[in-house]
Amino acid sequence: MKAVIKRVSEASVTIDGIKVANIQKGLLVLAGFEDADTKDDLEWMTSKIANLRIFDDENHVMNLSLKDIDGEMIIVSQFTLQASTKKGNRPSYLKAAKPEIAIPLYESFIKQMEAELGKNVQTGKFGTDMKVALLNDGPVTIVIDTKNKE
């Protein structure tokens, strides 16, 4: 599983002209799944994101987590995070999980995140063309891969 975590002042997701998700201060999480992802990967990623200390404290030091600031979150599925650009110029998405595997992983990730945060998480819609708008805060962007836990 790969995730791109963006600290935002605001973010929204629009589908067919209808805004389906809208947050203020918090995190926009783009999540991409592969066939080899496990329950342990989801649990590790959930804990890591929820507890990342990337929000400023009173001394303007990144020392607070989303949980600490009671921030909001949008999770958007994005299979293109699993792109391979090793060969040629056209990305290959062979590593991306097929919908029958990715959808349950995505839904489980959302449920785990809601349990970890103790509140609802807003989402996009799996497999749908979405317009994702955001106002970066910082900017702060973190990329995490469960296959490379550095």
Model-based region annotation:
Residues 1-89, 103-150:
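N-terminal, polar/charged subdomain of small-to-medium soluble alpha/beta proteins
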Residues 88-96:
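Short hinge/gating elements
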Residues 95-104:
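A short acidic, glycine-rich active-site loop
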